[in-house]
Amino acid sequence: MAQKRIDPKGLDLKERVVNINRVAKVVKGGKRLKFSAIVVVGDENGHVGAGHGKAAEIPDAIRKAIEDAKKHLIEVPIVGTTIPHEAIGDFGASKVLIKPAPEGTGVIAGGAVRAVCELAGIKDIRTKSLGSNNPANVVHATIEALKQLRRPEEVARIRGKTLEEILK
């Protein structure tokens, strides 16, 4: 299913740098150093995106990552303060399990997953990061898990049932 593009101009986006890494390209004369940045942006109201940027200077890498993240925004269905149901996201060797939690639980998540959940506006959630803990893959796996979420009304419509049948 194709994701509809979300216009970042109408949103009050906050950004959070998840990881900055120094990377090198080995050339004949030695090593060419650059910086790689992973940034998560979100409006804390159901929209979140992640981006990657690379440049010779750290601020430029962060700026590029923010631009990339704004191009890859997704909408997250939030029910009350949590998510509608469990989901598992896979990306590379990383796997992220996200589960709804009762109000007052808070965001129980590790570094990269926490950044995505908080900027998406999820207040109560339990997560478990499995496999690789590479920040780039964990962020993308979390986004994949959030993409799988469906509102109860949407599930009822797809299955051709009433909302009451789905919620019981």
Curated annotation (Swiss-Prot):
It comes from the Bacteria. GO terms for cellular component: small ribosomal subunit. Residues 13-76 form the S5 DRBM domain. One of its GO terms (biological process) is translation. PROSITE patterns: RIBOSOMAL_S5, S5_DSRBD. Keywords: Ribonucleoprotein, Ribosomal protein, RNA-binding, rRNA-binding. GO terms for molecular function: rRNA binding; structural constituent of ribosome. With S4 and S12 plays an important role in translational accuracy. The N-terminal domain interacts with the head of the 30S subunit; the C-terminal domain interacts with the body and contacts protein S4. The interaction surface between S4 and S5 is involved in control of translational fidelity. Part of the 30S ribosomal subunit. Contacts proteins S4 and S8. NCBIfam families: rpsE_bact. Belongs to the universal ribosomal protein uS5 family. This is Small ribosomal subunit protein uS5. It comes from Caldicellulosiruptor bescii (strain ATCC BAA-1888 / DSM 6725 / KCTC 15123 / Z-1320). The lineage of its organism: Bacteria, Bacillati, Bacillota, Bacillota incertae sedis, Caldicellulosiruptorales. The gene is rpsE.
